[in-house]
Amino acid sequence: MENPSPASILIIGSGVFGLSTAWALTKRQQFADTSITVVDDTSTGQFPPEDCASVDSSRIIRPDYADPDYTALAAEAQKEWRKQGDDDLGGQGRYNESGLVLTAYQDSLKLDAGIKSGMYYVKKSWENCVKVAQRDGEPADKIKVLGSTEALNSCLGTNTRPGDWGYLNSLSGWANASMGMKWLYNRVNATGRVSFVNAKAEQLTTEGDKVIGAKLSDGKCLAADVVLVAAGAWTGELIDLRGRVEASGHVLAYIEVSEEECAVLSKQPIVLNLTSGLFTVPPQGNMLKVARHSFGYLNPGTVHHALPLSPSLEREPIVVSKPYTNRDGIIGRLPHEADVHLREGLAKLSPIKGLEDRPWKKTRLCWYSDTKDGDWLVDWHPGWKGLFIATGDSGHGYKFLPLLGDKVLDCMLGKGGIYGQKWKWKDLEDESIGREVDGKFRGLITMDGSRGLPAGLVLEEELRRAPPIAV
């Protein structure tokens, strides 16, 4: 960082990365005289916008990771989630410690070289969670092995095949993500230190080898000493990150349940099968959510103003995977394969029979910002001065809300430690990933073992497949 106390910082994006970083900036004396601006495109004036990945009825809050570094970081964040005072992050229903059943199948699926299996992830996650629980003095029965399909069925009240091996972590839970982001926005706004601008950042502006701001959709320009891009799945439209970070869409749906059914389901843990990617979250009100944490849908499209890798290169049209949300138009239905798969999830993971036959009350695509290894990208751009990137959530950033902004700032200041190493800008191993090759888009695949099949699906192609399911 050229100036450790810049006069101005522009943050593009008000999701969990952007908003938590703004909050962290307001709390550090080093930035007491720094002007902080957050810009995002929101039709309602609400920050963050409703189609942001951080805004939803629920996000899983878990230390259950195959990587012990994330287990440790998530366990640290959970200390804040567990605080239940009205003004605390976890208060007023923002956090619920329902427990989590993590499971997978033993099936010998054909995975591409380098992709870890879901069962690998589950067993490593169990090992890491047990170690952290022992370290923190938690009772041994808080994490219980479910070593067979029968044991899983007994725990869940099902009579299906929810998995072949798994465990119940009673120390995990879920957060109402929309409520959590509202809590965070209110904290940031109350400081009086942050200016919020409702506009779309169309492109980054430069002067020589330095990024100096952003041009907005209304033609205005915002200037800053440091530009921090935290635009989630939209980051690839502003910066050429092909092969490093890629937008992928993930399906979720809601059905209506009765009061009697809700009384049963609200006592259930979250259930997540890492082979299929299917999971259910205990209901809120009378709405039950089922979703799929998979490799996701690609949506290739041309962008015209992405910042090239270095000042020696000209901006040119490139093809990247782009989010498609309600601001782009109403899809109106799920792809057929997603409809079938989500209903399979309800049938296998729920103790109540027949839920899979009900109509969807609501469906959505949640857009991740994926990386190959599941590690985020939080680093200075190597080709441009003044440009810091905080993206690549890979579908698992929200749970770190209480400390994410501080970790981003640590990386910005060159004090990121082991996480700075994980999240640094990485050289590409395959230059064809994230690009069109012979007319076909070669999507990035997250290979950490946390994703369920299928892989390589293109949204437009899947929507064309018969029969479409009206919702």
Which residues does each predicted region cover?
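Glycine-rich FAD pyrophosphate-binding loop
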Residues: 26-53
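Short beta-strand to alpha-helix junction loop
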Residues: 68-75, 116-121, 167-186, 330-341
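Beta1/beta-strand and adjacent pyrophosphate-binding region of the FAD-binding site
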Residues: 2-17, 37
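Helical element adjacent to the flavin cofactor pocket in flavoenzyme catalytic cores
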Residues: 166-218, 222-226, 230
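C-terminal catalytic lobe of FAD-dependent flavoproteins
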Residues: 340-470
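Short hydrophobic core segments
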Residues: 10-12, 39, 214, 221-235, ...
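Active-site substrate-recognition segment that forms the wall
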Residues: 23-28, 91-99, 221-226, 231-386
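Dinucleotide-binding Rossmann-like beta1-alpha1 core, especially the glycine-rich loop
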Residues: 57-154, 163-164
